[in-house]
Amino acid sequence: MADLDDIKDGKDFRTDQPQKNIPFTLKGCGALDWGMQSRLSRIFNPKTGKTVMLAFDHGYFQGPTTGLERIDINIAPLFEHADVLMCTRGILRSVVPPATNKPVVLRASGANSILAELSNEAVALSMDDAVRLNSCAVAAQVYIGSEYEHQSIKNIIQLVDAGMKVGMPTMAVTGVGKDMVRDQRYFSLATRIAAEMGTQIIKTYYVEKGFERIVAGCPVPIVIAGGKKLPEREALEMCWQAIDQGASGVDMGRNIFQSDHPVAMMKAVQAVVHHNETADRAYELYLSEKQ
């Protein structure tokens, strides 16, 4: 223990320099507590304010779909090229090495399969387990306009309330109700409702007409879903259009792991999201990286 006589009085207090208050600039997240902002800072690159998530949680309702037959062989080599991993707790514990050291968004809704009504989901993860697994956010579907709309919104509310107690962000993932058209009007409704319920991130689909209005009407960051597999050039164009119109990143799965050259595709997507490269430039990068 230090002797009282050994403690020297401080001298360099820089009294001419007031302490700076550094604002947290992620859209709509300035009033959150330190722990939640810290987790969001791991998801969204503080320099660019954007993120490239690698989604491989599809097995929770699709099983071993194409590209996800062996996570350890097909997906693990992609980890280092992603900003964030999105998966289930089962895959995280059984396949993802703890030394991977990537922020994780955990799938927190489920309890149904592709063989049944997908919107009939429940919360499938406790917040205690999310904290135990050192995740940076939890994610759940919200099915506006579906038969089980009410339950999916309740799931989101439950996760938001539990997350606020421990500083864990919640990401709402907009599923499409059977009778709803995938257009700006629908996604404006779905994203706004999810944000009003308190979610800190929204994952939704890009639409060609009016996407900038979806982003403007949503008070928290939007990341786009990759959706079904597209030709690489088209997928990069979708990324560029979304980022150009205000999206805060992408959460892509099939357009990465079902590509013939997934590492090259990851690098091309990173170029669009973090380096403002056009789709043409990113596609040139993809072609050069796949050699």
Swiss-Prot record:
Protein's cellular compartments: Cytoplasm
Entry annotated with the keyword Cytoplasm: yes
Gene3D superfamilies in alphabetical order: Aldolase class I
InterPro entries xref list: Aldolase_TIM, DeoC/FbaB/LacD_aldolase, DeoC/FbaB_aldolase, FbaB-like, LsrF
Coiled-coil residues: none
Keyword line: Cytoplasm, Schiff base, Transferase
GO molecular function, one term: acyltransferase activity, transferring groups other than amino-acyl groups
Main location: cytoplasm
A GO cellular component entry from the record: cytoplasm
Enzyme class: transferase
Keyword set includes Transferase: yes
One family name in Pfam for this protein: DeoC
Active site, UniProt feature: 203
EC number: 2.3.1.245
Catalysed conversion reaction: dihydroxyacetone phosphate + acetyl-CoA = 3-hydroxy-2,4-dioxopentyl phosphate + CoA
HAMAP family: LsrF (MF_02052)
Oligomer and partners: Homodecamer.
Function: Involved in the degradation of phospho-AI-2, thereby terminating induction of the lsr operon and closing the AI-2 signaling cycle. Catalyzes the transfer of an acetyl moiety from 3-hydroxy-5-phosphonooxypentane-2,4-dione to CoA to form glycerone phosphate and acetyl-CoA.
PANTHER family reported in the protein's UniProt record: 3-HYDROXY-5-PHOSPHONOOXYPENTANE-2,4-DIONE THIOLASE, FRUCTOSE-BISPHOSPHATE ALDOLASE CLASS 1
UniProt record similarity statement: Belongs to the DeoC/FbaB aldolase family.
Protein name listed in UniProt: 3-hydroxy-5-phosphonooxypentane-2,4-dione thiolase
Underlying gene: lsrF
